[in-house]
Amino acid sequence: MASGVAVSDGVIKVFNDMKVRKSSTPEEVKKRKKAVLFCLSEDKKNIILEEGKEILVGDVGQTVDDPYATFVKMLPDKDCRYALYDATYETKESKKEDLVFIFWAPESAPLKSKMIYASSKDAIKKKLTGIKHELQANCYEEVKDRCTLAEKLGGSAVISLEGKPL
């Protein structure tokens, strides 16, 4: 069921910036987003970038020690969100980076919010083409353990996530 909610151009621009890894200067790389949250606009008609809810690549190792743990703390207790997380992980064969689409719908979120976010998920996913991994979580227990994300990225083949062994 479609909700009629539109995806803002800002969301698509952020996605394209995160997806394309063109050769960049070190300064440009630092400004690239590692994680972002998307929310519904106040009138519930658009999916927009949530202001101030992002981690930049340049923050990692500076103001952010563990990007995944910091990302999990950004998720609201009592409302739904969509998120993009640029996961850096290692398998037995190689190092990889992949974007993960996350649908956060905590059990404590209002029913109306859960319904709108669930019915709008296809709209945002259609705009974010080429995402290989998706994670849906309904409580912090499902996201705080990095093994849950590693499972989505490649199961037992993944040996570390964000430089931390599993």
UniProtKB/Swiss-Prot annotation:
It is a peripheral membrane protein. It comes from the Eukaryota. The modification N6-acetyllysine is found at K13, K73, K144. The modification Phosphothreonine is found at T25, T63. The modification Phosphoserine is found at S3, S8, S41, S108, S156. GO terms for molecular function: actin filament binding; phosphatidylinositol bisphosphate binding; protein phosphatase binding; signaling receptor binding. Inactivated by phosphorylation on Ser-3. Phosphorylated on Ser-3 in resting cells. Dephosphorylated by PDXP/chronophin; this restores its activity in promoting actin filament depolymerization. The phosphorylation of Ser-24 may prevent recognition of the nuclear localization signal. Phosphorylated via a ARRB1-RAC1-LIMK1-PAK1 cascade upon active ligand stimulation of atypical chemokine receptor ACKR2. The modification N-acetylalanine is found at A2. There is a cross-link at K132 (Glycyl lysine isopeptide (Lys-Gly) (interchain with G-Cter in SUMO2)). Its main location: nucleus. The modification Phosphotyrosine is found at Y68, Y82, Y140. Belongs to the actin-binding proteins ADF family. This is Cofilin-1.
